[in-house]
C-alpha cells in the first residue's frame, strides 16, 4: 500500500542529534517527553546540562547548566522538575522551577530513592520508590502524599510508566522484568491497578496501559475505561492480547461490555513486546507501540483491529500523546522524533474497502467528522427512511460526518412525510434530535422557527437563542420581527444584518446605540438624516448624538459647521453652544471659524455666556479683532481690552474704569509692553488723578519689575504725587535694597506728614543713605526729633546728634536719648558735651541719672582722654558703695589710687575685682614690682615674663614658673629663642627647686626639661635630686628617668647607674637599652632581674653569639631558653644542632620549619628522630606524611609498609603524589596500591616499565586520562597490543579521539592506528568521530579503502572534516561523493568540473546540477560541456531548463558558433517566448529553409525583432519565406507593406485578408480598384465579402457600375440590404420598449409621491437637502419641505418593504 493512502500518516518531526545532542544521551534514562509540547534531554558531558526542546520552535533548544539525575518538563507550562540523589545517601532531592519567572516553586527531600517519576496531570507529579507510590502537588506547600504500596509482582521490576484517569480515582503502574528462563528474550510486563476510592490494588500482567473516557448509548455520564496490552508465554505458547475494560460501573446505567483482541506479531518479531499505549479521544482509537517499532491501531469501542505497520527501524523507548492532532509522538534510539496522525482523507475508505468493516467506517466518520463514508451514510439514511424509522434516520442525519445530511433536501424529506394523528411529526423529531446533538444551521433554524412562530411559542425561540442552539440569519430575524421586535433585533445583531439593525435602533429611537453598533461592525449610516430626526423631538438628545459623532474614529461624518447650522436654523443657541464648546476643546487652528462663530452668537444674545467662555481661555484661534469690537459693544470692556492689539483702541476702552473691575484692569496691565503700560497709566492719571491713582499705584506695585521702578517714580514725580510715591514705594520698600528708593520713601512720608512712618523706616531700614537722610532731617527740622535720633544712633552720628540737640536747646531729647534710647552711647554724649563746654553739673547729673546703665570703661576712656578722670570719683565710689563688682569700675578706682599713691599694695593684693592685666600695665612705668604683684595675682604669664626680663627679676620669675607648674609656660621660657633661658635655668636649679617640697612641682619641672630636649641640664637636675640624698632619692620614676635620659644623652654613665640604682623598671629599661644598641647593658639588666629568655635573645639576636647563648642555656637549663637557641640554630642553617636543641627543649611546635630545613639540608635521618618525638605530642597529617617521605628518602621501604599499617593520620594520596613527583616510584607504588588509587598506580607502573600491570591498573581505574597515559607510554615502548587495549577505551570518548590519533601519527604508527580505529568500529559505544577519523586515515594512508568506507558509513561520518581531508589529499571522486552526501551541491559541481578526469560522471553531474544554488555554476557547466562533452550538452540543458537564463545560454552558444548544437534545447524552451531563443531558432529555420517551422515559430512566439526578420525574408528566394515576411508585416500592423509584398507575389487572398484585418476602409477600396485595374473580377467579388464591414456600399456599386461588374457585386448588395432592414427593425422595437419603460417609471414615481404626501402633516419642518444629495426640489407652496421619503416612516399596508427595511431616502 502506498504511504499516501495509508490510514496513519507518519513524519519525522525532528532529530535530536541534529540539535547537537550526542547519541549516547538518546536513552530512556536521559530523555523525557511528558506531552507534545516539550522534550527534555539530560546531558552529562562535556558538562552537566539539561536541553529543553520546545516542539513549537525545535530549532531553538534551550540549554541550561543543571546537574540532575532526571528532568521532567510540565505537560502544559514552562515548569521544570529536577531530581538528584544526595551524595552518600539513598535519598533524592526534588525541586520544581518556573523557567520563565526564574523562580523555585517547591523542593522536597525524599527519604527514599525515587526510581521513576512522571507528570500525571499538569499540577501533579507521581513519584515511584522501591516500595511505594506518592503524589506531589505543585500548588501550596504540601509534601508528597503516599497513595499506595507497590504489589509483589512489581518487585525487582523496572518501572516504565505511571498514569491516572481524568478523575484521579484510578491509578496504574507499569513495570517490566527479565523474561522467563525458557524464553529470556521476551520481557515480562506487570501492572498494578489501584482504586483510590476503594483503596485496593489488583496485580495483572501487562506491558502497556492507558485510561480513556467513553460515552455509552443511554448513559449521559462517560464511563472510565482501562486499556492494556500484554504478551505472555504459557507452556511455550506466546499469547498477545489487548483488553478494554470498564472501571467502576455505574449502577442502573448501561455499561461498557468488556472487549479483547489479539495482537498479531510477525514471525520476525516474536520477542518484541509493547512498550507504550496512547489513546486518541478525538478519533476513539488505541495506539499500541512496541519496542522494535511496530504500531497496532485498534478501535476503542469495539477493539477491532484497524491497522498494523512498522513505523521505525530503530527501537522505540518513549512516546507521548498528541491531543492536538489525535495522534502521538515516538522517540527511537537514533534520536528521531516521529509524529503519527490519522490520515483524515484515507482512514474511512481504508476501513470500508480494505477491512470491509462498514459499520466501523461509519462510526469513525461520525465520531471524528471524517470524509469517505458519504455513500454508506446516505444509503443507510435512505434505508431507515424507507423503513419509516424516522427517529433513527434523524439521529443518523444529526451525526452524519461533515454535515452530509444536514441539508434543505433532508428537511424537505421529513416535511413530506404525512403526520399520523396523535404522533409527533417526523420533522419535529428530526429537529429535536438535532437540538440534543448541538446547534442548527441557518436553514434548519429558519424552518424550525416557522413552525414555532406559527404555533405562537415564542418562548421556545428565546430559550434556544439563549442556549445558542440556532444559527441567526437575516431571514430568521425577518420572520421573528412579525412577533417580537426585541428578539428580532437580537437576531439581526447576531446575524450581522447591519442595515436591519440600524433600522431597528432607529425605530426604537436608540440613536446612540446606532453609533456604537456601526463602529463595531464598520457600517456607515445616514448620520445627517438621523440628526435631523432627533432634533425635532429631543434637542438635548441631538446634542448628545452630535457629540457622539464627533468622537467617532476617523472624524465626525458630518461637518461641524453643518451641524451648527442645523441647531441655529431652529434658534437653538444654547444647544449649538453646548455642542461647539465640547467639540472645540482641542483648540485646533482649523476650527478658527467655529470658535469665532460661537463667540459671535453669544456676544449678541448671551454676553454673560461669551464672557464665561472667554474667561475659561479655551479658544485661541478665533477672529480676535471682530470679537474685540463685539465685546466693546456688549459692555465687556475688559474682554475688549484683552482682544484689542492697537494702543489707541486700548486707551479708548481703558478710561472706562467705572465698568472694569480694578483688579482685572491691574492684571491686564501685565499683558502690555512696558512703553504701552506707562502710556496707559499716564492717560489714567491725566483723566482723573485722584480717582485712578489707586489703580495706577496698584499696577505699578504689581509690575514694578517689568515697568521699572525708576520709570514709575518718574511718573509720580511728573505729577508731583508724593502720595502716589508714598503708596508705591511703601509696597516695594521691603524687597528693595536701593538706598535712593528708601530715601525717596522717607522724603515722601515726611512731606505727606507720615511722621510715624518716617520714624519706623529710619528705625528698621538698613539700606538708606544715612548721611543724606541725616542732613535731610536736620534741614527739615521736624517737630519730632525721634527720626533723627534713629538715624544718628544707628549709624554712629551721636556726636552730631548731641551737638544738634544741644545747639537747638533740645536738652530734653538728650536726656531721653541717654536714659531711654541708648545708655551705652552716654560716654560719647558726655565727651561731646565736654567738647561743647557744657556745665559740669549738667554732665554729672546726666551721669548720675543713668548710673548703673552707664558703661564705665568707655566713660573712663572719654574722661581719661580729656584728663577729666577725677570727675568720675564720686560716681565710682557711689557704684562701689552700692556693691558694684564691675571690673571697669574697680580698674578706674585702682588707677585713681595708684596715681594718688594711697597705699596701692593693699589695694592690689586685697581687691578681687580689678583686671590684673589692665592695672598691671598701668603700673609698669610707675613701679615694676607693683606690676609683678598685679600680674602674679592674675596669672598674666606673658606680661610677668616680659616685665621680669625687662627688669632682670629672674629669681621672681623662677619661683613663679616653678609654682605655676604650667607646661605651656615652661615651654615658653625654655625655648632656645629665649635669650634669658640660661639665667632662668640657673635660678631654677640653684634656688627654686631646692626650695620646693612639692613632688608635683618637681615632676612638672622634670617634664618641662624633657619636653624642651635639655638632657644634660636634666641629668644635672636629676643627679642633684636623686643622688644627693634628697627627699626624692628613692623615687622609682626618677630613677627610671635618670637611666633613660643617660641612655639617650650620655650612654657612658648607663652601666654605672645600673649598678648603683635598684628601684627601676628592669624589663622596660632593658628593652630601651636594646633599642639604643646598648646590648651588654641590656644583657646585664635582664640578667640582674632573672629575665633569662630576654637575656638569651639579646645574645642571639643582638650580640649574635650562639656559643655564648649555648653556654648560657647550659647554665640556666630552661626549656624556653633551649627553644630560643634551637630556633636561632635553625635560622643559621645548623639543622642537626637545631634538631638536637629542639629535642632538649621538648618543643614540637615548630615542626613545619624543622621539616622544611631538614629537607633543604637533606638530613632525613635526624628528621626521622625529630618527627618520632613530634608524633608523641601531636597527631598531624603533615607529620605522618613527612615521616613516610623521610623513610622513602633513606630507602626504608619496609618501615613505610609497617607504618601505613599502623594507625596514622597521613594524607596518603598527597604523600603518594609527592613520592611520584620526586621519582620515588617504588615507594609511590606501595602507597597507591594501599589506597587503591588505580589511576596513579597505573602511571607509576608505567614509570617502572611494568606495562602489563599498568594496563590492569588502568582497567580498574577506568579513567580516560589514565587510559591515555598508559596508552601513550605503551606506544612509546612499542607495546602495541597493550596500547590497542588502552586505545579502545579512549576513542569511545569524542574529545580524546583526536589526541590519540595525533599521538600515533606523530610517531609514524600509521598501520597500528588504522588497526585501532577499525577495531573501534565494532564497539557498542562507537561514535561518529571514530568513523570520521578512520576515513581521514584512509584518505592519508590507505586511499584504496576510502570510497568503500564512505559509502558504507556515510550516515555516521562527520562529513565536513572528511571533506577537508579528501581535499588536502586530492581524492576528487570521493570528495565529490561527500559533497553530495552533505548537500553541498555547489562545491560538488565545482569539484567535478575542475577535476573532470577523476570526478566526472554524466548522470551524477545532472543530479548535482539541478540542486546547485549558485546561478553562475549553471553557465560554467554549459562552458564545461561545450568544451569536453558537446554531445551531451542538450541533455544537461534540458535538466537545467527551469533554472537557466535562456538568453544568456543563447549568447554563449552564439559566441561559440554552436547554435545548431543546442537546437533541441531551444525548441524545448521556446514556449517561454524568450526573444533571444526565438531569434536564434528563426535564424536556424531561415538557414535550413524550414518555412513550416518558421511559420509556426512566428505564429506562436511573437517576442523577436519582427521587422528585422521580415526585411530579411522579403528578399528570400523561396515564395513561402516571402509570404512569411508579408505575414509578419501584417502582424506588426504594417498593412501597406504586407499588401504590396502579397501583390508582388500574386497572393491575392493574402491581400484581402490583410485588408480585412487592418480595418482600414481606404486600403480595402484601393484593393478593389487594383482588382478592377488587373481585370480580376472574381477577386473583386471575393474582396467585397472578405472586406464587407469596411467597404461602403455606394463605393462598391459605383465601381461595379462603372466597370461593368454589377453581376459580381450583386451578392454583396443583397447581403447589405438584408442586414440594413434587420437593423431598422431592431431600432423600432427598442424605441417602443423604451417609451413604455419611461411611462411606467413616471407612473410609479407619481404614486410614490402621492403616498408620501399622505403623512406630510405629521412631519416637522426640515432643512433643505444638503448639496450633493441629489434630491428633487421641494413641492410648490411649501418652501423648505423636502419630499416625504427618508424620514423613517414605513409605507402603510402589507406591501413589500424596500431594501434594508427603510423607505427610499428621498432628499437624504
Swiss-Prot record:
GO terms for biological process: intracellular protein transport; receptor-mediated endocytosis. The keyword Acetylation does not apply. Residues 1-492 are annotated as: Globular terminal domain. Residues 462-478 are annotated as: Binding site for the uncoating ATPase, involved in lattice disassembly. Residues 114-155 are annotated as: WD40-like repeat 3. Residues 25-67 are annotated as: WD40-like repeat 1. It is found in: Cytoplasmic vesicle membrane; Membrane, Coated pit. Residues 1564-1708 are annotated as: Trimerization. Pfam families: Clathrin (PF00637), Clathrin-link (PF09268), Clathrin_H_link (PF13838), Clathrin_propel (PF01394). Residues 156-205 are annotated as: WD40-like repeat 4. Keywords: Coated pit, Cytoplasmic vesicle, Membrane, Repeat. Residues 271-314 are annotated as: WD40-like repeat 6. GO terms for cellular component: clathrin coat of coated pit; clathrin coat of trans-Golgi network vesicle; clathrin complex. GO terms for molecular function: clathrin light chain binding; structural molecule activity. It is a peripheral membrane protein. Residues 653-1708 are annotated as: Proximal segment. Residues 493-536 are annotated as: Flexible linker. Residues 537-1708 are annotated as: Heavy chain arm. CHCR repeats lie at residues 551-697, 700-842, 847-986, 993-1138, 1142-1283, 1288-1434, 1437-1580. Residues 537-648 are annotated as: Distal segment. Residues 315-343 are annotated as: WD40-like repeat 7. The C-terminal third of the heavy chains forms the hub of the triskelion. This region contains the trimerization domain and the light-chain binding domain involved in the assembly of the clathrin lattice. The N-terminal seven-bladed beta-propeller is formed by WD40-like repeats, and projects inward from the polyhedral outer clathrin coat. It constitutes a major protein-protein interaction node. Belongs to the clathrin heavy chain family. Clathrin is the major protein of the polyhedral coat of coated pits and vesicles. This is Clathrin heavy chain 1. It comes from Oryza sativa subsp. japonica (Rice). The lineage of its organism: Eukaryota, Viridiplantae, Streptophyta, Embryophyta, Tracheophyta.
